[in-house]
Amino acid sequence: LAVFDTAGEVVCAKKRFLPVKEGQLGLRQSDALFHHTVALPEMLAELGSEFDLTQISAVGVSEKPRPVEGSYMPCFLAGVSAAEAFALARGIPLVRTTHQQGHAAAALFAAKGEELFREKTLLFHISGGTTDLLLCDEVKHIETLGTSSDLYAGQAVDRVGVKLGFGFPAGVEVSRLAAECDETIKPRSSVRGMECSLSGLENQCNALLTAGKSPAYVCKYCLLCVADTVVKMTKAAQKEYPGFAVVCAGGVMSSDIIRSWVQQRLPQVYFVPGRYSSDNAIGVSILAAREAGLWLK
């Protein structure tokens, strides 16, 4: 949950991880829907303790993963239900958007404020459920230019982490352990144009562990392979879209190791703070303000 004001400032934001049993790689949709339903009233109360909710002028909600036909996940129903109830009770507009557009809005805002909302931008959205290179047109229209043909980057990172005994999601722990490795590593990535394949990454990491490489080495190798994939896909995109700003978002892109590798090779690429890069409601609140005519008029 987040509050964004008409002055273009994030007033407050709340988030919490849903509980995942040890050794598992996520939640079933029925369990995710249940936990969302339980958490939302509690988090709304927390938000209300920091901000006067009677001052809210519009409500935004992500109703599905992506702005394409057929995109659907049951757990989004919890947020839609809560948002509809709040908006109806207050008699204020309800703005429906998507998880992907929320990520895009938060990342573009963190990168350059309102500037990137007025132009076309290249955006990497890399998380547990996406490895997408997107062409964003004011976040109103999003076109997928490239993606993974199999495993997503976040899945690869989480699988390595869970195999090493970390809880899900494992990205933070994988990054922490990777930082302990000072060996020089040459990653191997599979990229063709703006498309990539990451299924081999999991196998490579398992083989390295079997060969006796340290967990820290394997974690660093995994993250650098993701980083190298980003570099190659970005270079391919820049050939077709020269001069476009490039912004990286998604939980995986919060890694300092990935950021350092990419920016050493592509210093013009924008990475945004973890607060705006990982899953959050900030982008959705920004889009609600814009679509309701309260910001970026």
Regions found by a protein language model. Name each.
Residues 1-34, 141-144:
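Short glycine-rich, Thr/Ser-proximal phosphate-binding strand/loop in the N-terminal lobe
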Residues 2-4, 11-13, 115-119, 124-126, ...:
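A short helix-loop
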